[in-house]
Every structure is written in C-alpha cells, then in structure tokens.
Amino acid sequence: MAEQGLTYIHPFDDPDVIAGQGTIGMEILRQLPEQLDAIFIAVGGGGLCAGIAAYVKQLRPEIKIIAVESDDAACLDAAIKADRRVRLKQVGIFADGTAVAQIGKETFRLLKELVDEVITVSTDEICAAIKDVYNEIGRAHV
C-alpha cells in the first residue's frame, strides 16, 4: 500500500480513530448534561466504546460505561475474563457490525480500565431491541 502512496487506517485499533469516535461522547454529554447514569455502547473491535468511554470518564467518571456484545461475538468479555486478548474461533454474523473475533490491542488496553461492566445479548434480544426502536421512533419516519 505504501508504495502506491496509500495509507492504511485501522477501523478500530488506531489512536486517531478512537479519539474521533470519542466525539460521540462529547455529543452525548452536551445533549444530556445532567441526566445520565450509564451509557450502553455496542462493542466489536472496541474503538467506538474506547473513544466514548475515554471522553466521558475524563469529564464524568461517575457515569457507568456498559459495553454490550452479541453473545456469539463476545471478544471483549472473553479478553477481560482471561486478562489478555483472546481470538474467538468463530463469531456470529447477525450483528455483523460488531462481529469481530479479537478485540483490538489498544482498545483492550483502554477498555479494561474504563468499562464498568460487559453484558452479552442474544440474537433474539437484538431482534427485540430493533423492533422496539422501530415501534418507538421508526414509524414516525416511514
């Protein structure tokens, strides 16, 4: 790639990408300045969660950061339990945006310090949540 003048930017395990994703944390705190007890963040490779958590914990350490993973792609949960990054043998693909076999090196370093809890959800729970969001706000935009 370099010989062609191209630069590879890792989709989640890059400090600049993580910092950029932290701006979502800034938006959350701006829009909900006093009403927040916890933020639930989907985790694949961990960049989004690491960015949001780093920003939020710096300004509002009392806010709980809850990482949410599909139970068939729970690479952060496995890494935290093992206290090291773990490569899953297989990952489910229903939640394809978070279907990652191994949490990033930099994201794991951050998340093991910043995340208050990791929860896993089943495909059925993901489907139910999609339906709930559609019923709550989706119909207004159809």
Model-flagged regions — what are they?
Residues 1-141:
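PLP-dependent amino-acid enzyme catalytic core
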